[in-house]
């Protein structure tokens, strides 16, 4: 890699500040950002230099493609950049979970739930069942063991709601 490439694509220091508490900022997006988002939602290049491929597709440099993705992440427009797998076809099992958590115990309960890498989503809702999360494990036995362990450590029962039929697994947010 050239010195210019390193300076552009691997700047020293840290990102500049946070823009709000988790709120995405889309007001500074141009047409290239929108095209970039359309492409990477479903067709992120599986290549040794994916940002070079993105840059070529968009008519920009590799460094600019990487810089744009970084900026979109910093502004929380991109929340996650990674692969999605069909966990069921890989033999994994997942479930939707709900719990009635007293308000004064929410932080402790959420901390216990979130410490498990098997938990993929966790939401606070305005409902009798106020904490909802999903978990995925290599087997049903491990799903049940994980949920039993959380209940044991927190004293809060968890409603286990495995899917009986899958209707939709993904969505693309078209930007054009």
Curated annotation (Swiss-Prot):
The keyword Lyase applies. Residues 1-24 are annotated as: Disordered. GO terms for biological process: heme biosynthetic process. GO terms for molecular function: lyase activity. Belongs to the Ahb/Nir family. Keywords: Heme biosynthesis, Lyase. Pathway: Porphyrin-containing compound metabolism; protoheme biosynthesis. Involved in siroheme-dependent heme b biosynthesis. Catalyzes the decarboxylation of siroheme into didecarboxysiroheme. The keyword Electron transport does not apply. This is Siroheme decarboxylase alpha subunit. The gene is ahbA. Its EC number is 4.1.1.111. It catalyses: siroheme + 2 H(+) = 12,18-didecarboxysiroheme + 2 CO2. SUPFAM superfamilies: Winged helix' DNA-binding domain. Residues 12-24 have a biased composition (Low complexity). Binds heme b, but reducing agents do not affect the activity of the enzyme.
């Amino acid at each position: 890699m050239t010195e210019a490439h390193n300076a552009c694509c691997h700047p020293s220091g840290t990102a500049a500040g946070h823009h709000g508490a988790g709120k995405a900022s889309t007001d500074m997006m141009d047409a290239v950002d929108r095209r970039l988002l359309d492409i990477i939602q479903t067709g992120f290049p599986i290549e040794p230099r994916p940002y070079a491929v993105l840059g070529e597709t968009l008519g920009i440099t590799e460094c600019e493609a990487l810089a744009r993705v970084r900026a979109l992440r910093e502004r929380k427009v991109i929340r996650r950049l990674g692969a999605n797998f069909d966990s069921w076809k890989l033999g994994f099992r997942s479930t939707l979970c709900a719990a009635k958590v007293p308000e004064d115990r929410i932080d402790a309960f959420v901390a216990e739930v979130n410490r498990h890498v098997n938990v993929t989503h966790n939401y606070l809702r305005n409902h009798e069942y106020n904490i909802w999360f999903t978990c995925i494990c290599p087997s049903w036995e491990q799903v049940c063991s994980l949920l039993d362990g959380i209940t044991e450590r927190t004293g809060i029962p968890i409603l286990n709601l495995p899917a009986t039929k899958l209707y939709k697994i993904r969505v693309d947010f078209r930007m054009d």
